[in-house]
């Protein structure tokens, strides 16, 4: 039953059901608050029941108001009128921190809940809202500023944000400038940037679509506008990534600038760039803010593998674009690889050993090693292994690579090799007590851990730990399940072992779906949720604290798979998230910071300054 009473704004209506006598009902008016507000505003306009007069600091105009209204909307006025201050008993109060325009805006808002803003009244309104602690007005001012940011006013909006400590607006302005910096350079507004904001922009990994040379020239323009700005030259130049410029650009455009030759800090920056470029093999262990890729785009990356159809080995390097939910290609390897080892040092991707041809016995193992540089989307060859090896594990630890075990035409391997980027050479370290292949490994706490694998055709459950400082192997608590061709990774203080296969009975292989993690502190294994589907000989990577298991081979289904499964350690849950472009076994995966997908890494602006041979000769 619908009941309606009255007309107009004060009318009410409700849908009622018959009820027993004595039942209590509650009613709410949707219009009462606005009617009361309108009533108070009319009283103010007519000067009725006003009990205090406010006077702005910049004039004598008076604003009669009601103390209760002002105190209900502002902590400032509440403290003034109830906190025992002298103004509590005054009938006329001068507000020295607020001007006429700002005070009128605040009073109108308190009485009407409405606010009109433009660039002419914004700062007066902001100043009054900040002084009088009117938070809704501050929020409206922030929205107004953010919604109107453009190339023509971004510098001014940034100044206002800094003046009034509008953190959200300041962050938005920074992001706007970073996204539109090339366009801003072509306007006069660029030269109005304050030093602090320009330095932030030039230091940011989110700055896109500009070469380091273009950034250097822009910084020089800004410095030369006014003589006092030259005092900032050294501080500004520290944000330019000179090591990433070509030697030709350094000579032709940078060294010809006077302060780059006379200022000690700038001279040292050029020396740093020169030293960096002369040591191409050492670069992964020479990384700094000025040598890092100018990108904030980190992605899951996969490399190589053997195709399900025709058993062709892939040389593809791909990254997964999470936003577009699709795979994108990076520069492929010169030669295909599977059963290889990959590891990352200083955001350089190393690809070690493996096989170029499909061969389950490892007789076509190779010893070659290549390094991918995402800054230029290019590969270069580095020193080869001392031994050919496949089905092995590769770890990056303390700026070195460690290639552990594996197999080759000579048989199963127990040897371990260490690559030193500073010397560009491999050397032997302490070998394992027994040969292993198909094992997995990870690093934690400055130590390398190796689990499972196959020794003399027998699947293992042992866990071994290698200390690079003492060059010794030690035995740890074994896994609860024997397994090989599995994967291993570290999340937090836990070492996860996932998937793989082992013998079912005496001769047939079977997927291992069970998973477990090892606690180095407790020397103890704990089971976790089982995989949804079997995967052996996979790629594994930790991305945003989730474990991604990529591709591989399913022994239960007797085929390569394209599935990518994600494990959430916090929830102890597995999910199928997406697929590879094709089914690939013996694939490898990692995370790498690369240029955003919309950029073309192969453009001339990505010319590599490397002086090392790039023809693999």
From Swiss-Prot:
SUPFAM superfamilies (alphabetical): Kelch motif, POZ domain
Gene Ontology MF: a single term: cullin family protein binding
Domain of life: Eukaryota
Pathway: Protein modification; protein ubiquitination
GO cellular component, one term: midbody
Gene3D superfamilies attached to this UniProt entry: 1.25.40.420, Kelch-type beta propeller, Potassium Channel Kv1.1, Chain A
Kelch repeats: 300-347, 348-399, 400-446, 448-493, 495-545, 546-595
Domain BACK per the UniProt entry, residue ranges: 154-255
Residue stretches making up the BTB domain: 50-119
Alphabetically ordered keywords of this record: Cell cycle, Cell division, Kelch repeat, Mitosis, Repeat, Ubl conjugation pathway
Stretches the record annotates as Disordered: 595-617
Keyword Nucleus: no
CDD domains: BACK_KLHL9_13, BTB_POZ_KLHL9_13
InterPro entries: BACK, BTB-kelch_protein, BTB/POZ_dom, Kelch-typ_b-propeller, Kelch_1, SKP1/BTB/POZ_sf
Keyword Ribosomal protein belongs to the record: no
GO BP annotations listed: cell division; protein ubiquitination; regulation of cytokinesis
Subunit structure: Component of the BCR(KLHL9-KLHL13) E3 ubiquitin ligase complex, at least composed of CUL3, KLHL9, KLHL13 and RBX1. Interacts with AURKB.
Function: Substrate-specific adapter of a BCR (BTB-CUL3-RBX1) E3 ubiquitin-protein ligase complex required for mitotic progression and cytokinesis. The BCR(KLHL9-KLHL13) E3 ubiquitin ligase complex mediates the ubiquitination of AURKB and controls the dynamic behavior of AURKB on mitotic chromosomes and thereby coordinates faithful mitotic progression and completion of cytokinesis.
UniProt-recorded name of the protein: Kelch-like protein 9
Species the sequence originates in: Bos taurus
